[in-house]
Regions:
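Alpha-helical segments flanking ligand/cofactor-binding loops in enzyme cores
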Residues: 98, 189, 268-269, 320, ...
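Bacterial N-terminal signal peptides
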Residues: 9-20
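Positively charged n-region of N-terminal signal peptides that target proteins for export
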Residues: 1-6
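Primarily recognizes the serine-hydrolase "nucleophile elbow" in alpha/beta-hydrolase
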Residues: 194, 240-311, 584-657, 663
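Cap/lid segment of the alpha/beta-hydrolase catalytic domain
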Residues: 162-246, 252, 286-296, 514-591, ...
Length: 675
């Protein structure tokens, strides 16, 4: 290091109260850098391309504690989850349950086109009857969950029925065999042999409905269009109940639902919200959102974590909403998938028990823990617990009723034997989203040119902010370190944003910076040296930022599941990211006093929330530069992208009003440069 550079470094270190590089003081009381420092540096070190090794080393320095991004997102989510208070009276709870049920249906499930799906006249087609086994037969059918989406199903019917009998809807989870899974067939067979009508339905994405179009992560494509992605899952179950209850021998007072895993989720979801269900047995299917935030195995995928569900209810609420109807909670002691009994069961019992007591039905709440085999199963032990539950509540006076499994393995059919013809163009989650996206954004709600954007800019900007849940985050800056090597000046920061997030920022300058640019990349700052070197060589001060979900701020495990869980609380990951970028831009403008900062992004994801930040932050962000940007949200649907690939891009309702071109118009007259 030259003597001059040693003097400059000493001066730089002495200015610790103003640790940013070559900037005017942030406040009058702070000491300014040496008056002639920039000119001296220029003469001593004419601008060259910065040393790549030095840039890479500065960018690679860790600024956050281990697991800090995880801890912060867990705390953020938990602070937004609804809590269940014990009811003070029977009447109070009944009113609460009615309101929760109404709000969940209206504000979460039946949004957008889902309302029309709910009210549509739909078909049921009865097909072949095949032999079952001693005492029962199987009727094949298909029914529409919503227009164009047919669900294959099997109805197990006892022979020689008379009068009315209990009916049971059997749903299932992530088993590629779907309705042909042997343990599901055995359950339906045993129900029929006990005199009940059992409906075995296929689940979206499984069995005959397997395929990329029904990947559960595709349901968020519907969310993007402003229609609830959870609606097809819910409607598939309500229509199944319609089919069951239309049977002339159905007893409407004895209506059960049971299922494993995703079927356990389906069981509590439909049973808590559809009061036609009079008994439910969810098996290893769910836990409270509070539990999920701390136990990664319980972080359910898209249907378990629909957008905005936790603005109304937690799964503890749904459990309590079964009261006073009989409920059997079944969990497995050594579950090798999810929802292990040791952590999942007790919070649900704690929530539901006071409600069952308040309603005078403490004996209607049951639980069962499977010890052998204890893994993720609805095996014989769990099935026998279910049969016992049915006997207790549906056949209390039947002498000789037994909960013992009736051996029926020889009657299990192959998937081919149980196959049901489906239309070649049967709808999928993806095809439904394609149909919706075709006419979006809605023309009467959007704008197409700079003139109309300018006229309605403030209104559209506010609407965009509301859709992404944008927030004005206060910034508290903590300076970590500063240094110089071969003319490259670096300063490391932690920026505390809104009291919730800590975002790492690396400040770099080579020579005299003529402007400040905030840089963000999908790959993270540490893998973006060439792009940052280019900006430095162009005479810019670079603030290399890793916002929520990227680079050093990336959650080490299950990251996309935490992102959709944040969306379930009513927040939007896209808005979190855009708000962080906007806050850092304001900080950079005020800190360095060179006017509005520029924003440079690399990658389709960072370019999208960077564009939104630029549209919303008119004063602090000037020029917006992007490389490899997303050109339309419709490409996510056309290419059948799943939410796990880029969860922030599936922001509920955004495409209904804004595509990328409309957001770009809100940036005008500021410059957008695409590389």
């Amino acid at each position: 290091m030259t003597r001059l550079n040693r003097l400059l470094l000493a001066a730089f270190t002495a200015a610790a109260a103003t640790p940013h590089l070559f900037a005017a003081p942030a406040a009058p009381a702070a000491p300014a850098p040496p008056a002639r420092l920039p000119e001296v540096v220029v003469r001593a070190n004419p601008i060259h391309w910065p040393d790549p090794a030095a840039v890479a080393a500065a960018l690679a320095r860790p600024l956050l504690e281990t697991n800090q991004p995880l801890t912060e997102v867990q705390d953020y989510i938990e602070s937004r989850l609804p809590r269940l208070d014990a009811p003070r009276s029977k009447g109070e709870w009944q009113q609460t349950a009615r309101e929760l049920r109404r709000d969940t249906l209206e504000k979460v499930i039946f949004r957008g086109q889902a309302r029309a799906w709910r009210d549509a006249e739909l078909g049921v087609e009865w097909l072949d009857t095949i032999p079952g086994g001693p005492g029962y037969h199987i009727r094949k059918l298909r029914y529409e969950a919503l227009p164009g989406l047919w669900i294959p199903a099997l109805l197990y019917v006892p022979d020689n029925l008379s009068g009315t009998v209990p009916v049971v809807l059997n749903v299932n989870g992530h088993d590629r065999n779907g309705k042909a899974a042997d343990y599901k067939q055995l359950r339906c067979i045993n129900l029929a042999k006990r005199g009940m009508i059992a409906l075995n339905v296929e689940w979206l994405g499984m069995g005959q409905l397997r395929g990329p179009g029904n990947n559960h992560g595709a349901m968020n494509q519907l969310d993007l269009c402003g229609t609830s992605g959870i609606a097809p899952f819910y409607l598939a179950m309500t229509r199944a109940l319609d089919v069951l209850l239309a049977h002339r021998h159905a007893d409407r007072k004895r209506v059960g639902v049971a299922g494993l895993s995703g079927g356990g989720w389906g069981t509590i979801f439909i049973s808590s919200l559809d009061t036609r269900v009079t008994l439910a047995n969810p098996v290893a299917g769910y836990s409270s959102f509070f539990t999920r935030a701390r136990y990664f195995s319980d972080l359910g995928d898209s249907e378990q974590t629909p957008s905005d569900l936790a603005t109304v209810v937690d799964y503890a609420h749904l459990t309590a909403m079964m009261a006073p109807r009989p409920l059997l909670l079944t969990f497995n002691a050594k579950d090798n998938c999810c929802f292990r009994a040791g952590h999942a069961l007790q919070p649900l019992l704690d929530a539901a028990t006071p409600v069952y007591h308040a309603l005078g039905k403490p004996g209607a709440l049951h639980y069962h823990v499977n010890l052998s085999p204890g893994d993720h199963n609805f095996g014989e032990d769990n099935r026998e617990a279910f049969y016992e539950m049915l006997g207790h509540h549906f056949f209390p006076d039947q002498p000789g009723y037994s909960n013992r499994e009736i051996p029926s393995q020889a009657e299990v059919k192959t998937a081919e034997q149980l196959a049901i013809p489906l239309p070649a163009n049967n709808a999928t989650l993806n095809s439904l989203a394609r149909d919706l996206a075709r006419n979006l954004p809605r023309r009467e709600k959007t704008f197409t040119d700079q003139k109309t954007a300018g006229a309605w800019g403030p209104d559209h900007r506010l609407h965009l902010q509301m859709l992404v849940r944008g927030a004005d985050l206060a910034v508290s800056a903590k300076h970590i370190a500063a240094g110089e090597k071969d003319g490259l000046w670096t300063s490391h920061w932690q920026l505390r944003l809104g009291g919730d997030w800590t975002v790492p920022v690396v400040e770099l300058a080579y020579g005299v910076p003529k402007s400040t640019v905030v840089f963000i990349a999908d790959a993270g700052r540490a893998k973006s040296s060439p792009e940052i070197e280019r900006l430095l060589a162009d005479g810019k001060r670079v603030l290399a930022v890793d916002p929520f979900y990227f680079g050093e701020s990336k959650i080490a495990s299950h990251d996309w599941l935490f992102a959709i869980l944040a969306a379930a609380t009513g927040e939007r990951p896209l808005g979190i990211q855009a708000s962080q970028v906007a806050a850092i831009a304001r900080w950079g403008r005020d800190q360095f006093r060179q006017g509005p900062v520029e924003l440079s992004t690399v990658g389709p994801r960072s370019s999208t929330f960077g564009l939104i930040a630029t549209a919303l932050e008119e004063k602090a962000i000037g020029k917006f530069e992007r490389k490899n940007p997303l050109t339309s949200f419709k490409t996510l649907i056309d290419s059948n992208r799943s939410v796990n690939e880029s969860p922030e891009l599936f922001c509920f309702g955004l495409l209904e009003y804004f595509d990328i071109p409309q957001i770009e118009l809100l940036v005008a007259p500021r410059q957008i440069v695409t590389r």
